[in-house]
Structure formats: C-alpha cells, structure tokens
C-alpha cells in the first residue's frame, strides 16, 4: 500500500493503539502531516481507558505540537487508518469505519484489509512510515518536528538503537534530521519521581524462576508503558533471559512479556 492510496477518502481518522508509546504517536503524526499536505483534514486519536500521562510522551506531544486526542466514542469515519497496530488485534479500541487501513511492523495477528502495509522485519513502525513518506516524495528532513518524532519512535522501540538489524532502520537512524536538544530532554524524561517509586517497589519484590531464567514482576498502578521500562531494567541482570512485568488495570491485566532473543522485544498485552 502507498500513502497516496489514502487520498481517495475525505473523512479520515488515524488511530494509534491504546496506551500509546512514542512509536505509534510518531507514526500517526507522520501520516497526519502527509494527509494535511494533500489538503485533507484528518484526526489523530487513540482510545482505551488510559489517557497519556507518561512524562516523556507528554513532553513529546507538547514540544513537537502533535495534535493527538483521546476519545471514548468515534462517529463512523469514511476511513480509519491504524498505525503501529491492527484492527481487532486486542491492543486498540475498536471503532467502526466504512474502510480500514493498517500500517504496522508487528506480526500479523488478524485478517488484514486490502489497504495495508505490514513489515514485521522492521524494528519500529516509525521506520515504515518514514520509508512510505519518502516514497511519496514527502520532505521528512525538512520537517524537524516530524524527523525528531520518528527518530525517537525508532529509538524507543529498538532499545535505544541497540537492537537495529534491518537496513531501513539504520537509514532512519543515520538520516533523521532530529532536534538534539529535544532528544536529550526526551531521553532524560522516562520516569517521574512517582513512577520511580512504583518501579523501585516492584523490583524489590521480583519473583525469579531459575529453571527458565525468568523474572515475574508485579507492578503497582502506573502508565502501562512503564512495564516495558521495568522489563528492560530486569533483563540487564545476567541470570535473566525472560521478564514478565504486569499490573492490574480496571479493564483487566496488562502484561509486558520480553525475551532477549526476540528482535522486537516489547509486547504489551491486555
């Protein structure tokens, strides 16, 4: 699928997955700016119970002027574009639409619509959107805010760029015209003091299963994206290859299941 194929529709909504992370926000922003450049008036939304409150994501949205909005209800659009997720995949609110499009880098877990572009071998969906924008002749380097968002999306989804394998991921890393000052702020804003206390309490009570070299971490109430950060920290322990971090949410249980051998490490499951 090419981004230009979306131009056949007028009432367009771009949907990020629930509990948005930097990658899905950046992807939605990229598609949003492309459609705006072509005279469309899209909306950028996400659903679910949780409103974005993680410090770095609030900063990302504010500093890069990303017009994302949280919704509980969506009037049926002509086209719903899922970014960094798939329709009925379980990690995003289900809204009705006349037509569905999917742009994703995860493994295919549901039936894909005709309008879809899924590249499961990429480290981040930001790389896919970046490449699709370049294919359409969109000047990503000329937009510092978008370049920074896509670079940060790649940065966070590839373990601070340490898990890059695909050449396209390397190309985005090397070519992105990002804002160094904003990147420094984002890198140093992963945790608030409150979240640090939650993470510390969880780590103190980690259960270790020696037979499987696995750690199980129960986490208190926090932004679900904190689960991935805790898992990353736990996996730095030499005796641990698998980490399951979880917490109880009003709508169920959130899991972050990470194995060090997986190329795409973070899997947030409801």
What are these regions (language model features)?
Residues 16-18, 48, 64, 83-86, ...:
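Fold-independent oxyanion-binding glycine-rich loops
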Residues 11, 41-43, 79, 98-99, ...:
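Residues at the starts of beta-strands that form the adenosine-phosphate
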Residues 12-73:
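Anionic-ligand anchoring segments at beta-strand to alpha-helix junctions in alpha/beta enzyme folds, i.e.
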Residues 51-52, 88, 103, 161, ...:
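Active-site environment of divalent metal-dependent phosphoester hydrolases
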Residues 59-115:
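Active-site cofactor/cluster-binding pocket
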Residues 2-19, 29-37, 110-252, 258:
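A structured phosphate/pyrophosphate-recognition subdomain
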Residues 258-270:
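Single conserved hydrophobic/aromatic residue that forms the stacking wall/gate
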